[in-house]
Amino acid sequence: MLTEAQVVALEKAKTEKEAHGEFESEHHPGYCGAQDTFYVGNLKRVGRVYQQTFIDTDAKLACTKLYDRKTPITAADLLNDRVIPFYESHDVKLLRILTDRGSEYCGNPERHEYELYLAVEDIDHSRTKTKSPQTNGICERFHKTVLNEFYRIAFRKKVYRSIDEL
């Protein structure tokens, strides 16, 4: 039996979880995807390169795409170009996306391109707590692996002149 203080503490914790977009994870592909932006580097003759990353948190499927800027349009483009078509080809509905609170993901829902795209596709948007990158740890770990296993090796072997070449 719970005391009154314990019930109040549980209700407060539940309210706090909802306020920060935390949720109990179901276990099926499409229930939740994590999306993040990774700064690859500044390449000569190319400029800044950013990688948009999407990972299905259950299936561990990753989709990435490189861009020369980090904007709401590029964040939505990854979903529109790679993620949603993949899920549709397998008759799976993407239900929720977890992102950080970066400007490419968060803004006025009536004018922000990424927020508008999620609304059109009927995808719920959860956000991590401020200054808590570990909340989206699946993307953080993936970025570290890609950096060590691909980018550092690729950049030692060749000079890339375009994002498409990379």
Model-inferred region functions:
Residues 61-65, 126-128, 152-154:
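Short small-residue beta-strand/loop micro-motif enriched in glycine and branched aliphatics
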Residues 1-55, 61, 77, 81:
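Mobile-element integrase/transposase regions
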Residues 2-25, 29, 119-123, 144-166:
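C-terminal domain-tail junction helix/linker
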Residues 99-101, 105, 111-118, 125-149, ...:
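RNase H-like two-metal-ion nuclease catalytic core shared by retroviral integrases
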Residues 94, 124-125:
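Hydrophobic beta-strand scaffold residues
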Residues 65-92:
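Active-site beta-loop-alpha junctions of metal-dependent nucleic acid enzymes
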Residues 58, 68-72, 102:
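A short acidic/small-residue loop/turn micro-motif
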Residues 60, 97-100:
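Buried hydrophobic side chains on well-structured beta-strands
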